[in-house]
Amino acid sequence: LVGITTLRQKWEAFVKDGRFSYLTVDYLSEKFPVEDCGENLFIASHVIATQHMAECAVALKPGKALLADTRGGERILLAVRGSMDDFMRFSEQHDGCELFEDKVDAITNVYDIFMLNGRQIEEDFEVLTKGREGQSIPRSNTVIGDPDLIYIESGAIVEGVVLNASH
């Protein structure tokens, strides 16, 4: 969990058909198995998805791959469209890969979760509330910070509480 949603939920929000498999380490492969089909979209499980990134990954043609540079300066295999053989080939050598133009956020160390959490909360808030209209904040509540940063789902009962949106 980085921000409000998990890394998987971030990808699912942008990959509309939800069909992708993770490029992950061996011990996580049981929890996140590869979809059993001929052609697959493999994505790097430690990368925080953005709309543009997901669009570029989904648009890959079969047998193609996408590399990216992380903000930490590491070049990674971001996505592969194709078979398990294609994935293995691109994992070993990056010849013929396209380069994603933006730097990406990736969780490579435990502390990355904490360093990226604030910005991810803000980005997730935008995605989750886009096009939705919540209810106004009842007067029995105390608001600290910007009330525009507080979303209350219609029908929720929120009375007599302190809502802190300062940080």
Residue spans of the language-model regions?
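A structural motif detector for beta-strand N-caps
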Residues: 135, 141-142, 150, 154-162, ...
